[in-house]
Amino acid sequence: YLMIFPMMLGMMLVSEFLVSKIPIEGEFFGPLYDQMSDAFSTIATDTAGIYLLTVLFAPFLEEILFRGIIQKGLINKGVKPAKAIIFSALAFGIFHLNPWQTVNAFLLGLVLGVVYYKTKSLLMPILLHAFNNFISAYLLLNGNSESVTENLHLPEYYGLIVGIVLLSVSYYLFMYRNRIYYRE
């Protein structure tokens, strides 16, 4: 199961690159981005609170809802697993209510959904979600930027390339390790 952490980190880097392409200025995006920045600045004043909320409570509650109830419920009702994973990831993305987090949450929700489907346990998605949120909270509170690649002083395309490689290799190894055999 250790392959899921590089897989998650890879998706985080890919997502970070894609989210960086969403405008933060303009008639629509500018005021929305300013509101979100102000809200996060206000939240960031309570270090213990932000870690408690984002690293402990959110992963636990959100994974129960989106993977444990929505995704599992759809699969139990006969929806194909791929469609259930996509739908629960989309709902997870929309739940985050702003374009920057929606894209990120959707993509990460895909990884969380696959991991939940393959492991049949909420523990791994909760740990991955906490891992993602810990990195985000740490960068928000301690970094110059919320971007992993910016904090490492790397061009964003390096982050994308590393992300794709990490995601692809670890996804392949995870799927190979967790393949399902059918008896005839």
Residue map of PLM features:
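Functionally important transmembrane alpha-helices
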Residues: Q101-L154
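Juxtamembrane helix-loop-helix connectors linking adjacent transmembrane helices
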Residues: Y1-A58, N76, E146
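Residue-level signature of the transmembrane alpha-helical core
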Residues: F5-P6, Y51-L56, F60, I86-L90, ...
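Short, Lys/Arg-enriched, Gly/Pro-containing loop segments at transmembrane-helix junctions
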Residues: R179-E184
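Active-site His/Glu-centered metal-binding helix of metallohydrolases
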Residues: F60-L65, I69-I70, I94, N98, ...
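Membrane-interface starts of transmembrane alpha-helices
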Residues: D46-I50, T54, N76-S88, S121-M124, ...
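Hydrophobic core of alpha-helical transmembrane segments in multi-pass integral membrane proteins
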Residues: M7-V14, Y158-N178
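Membrane-interface helix/loop boundary segments of multi-pass membrane proteins
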Residues: L61-F87, V114-S121
